[in-house]
Amino acid sequence: TIEQRARRAVDRCLSHMASLGLEDYNNEVFLRYAARLFPFQEVRSEMAFIQGKGPKGKANLKCFLDGMLVLAEED
């Protein structure tokens, strides 16, 4: 379904944000988007998962969409 496709896309976005944070914690894209689009604890969990130190972070579609609205209003 469309909702499942959206959830998978948001999950990939969480993974990419976590990877950016692992490479460079002060990356401008990471700082601007990660905290607005996802609960930061979930980003940290995903970072730990990528390093093999913990469970996978959970992407929240509603939180992601709320963050997108906030970002759209800022621009």
Regions found by a protein language model. Give the residues of each.
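Charge-biased C-terminal accessory regions appended to nucleic-acid-, cytoskeletal NTPase
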Residues: 18-75
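Flexible loop/N-cap segments at domain edges
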Residues: 1-14, 22-26
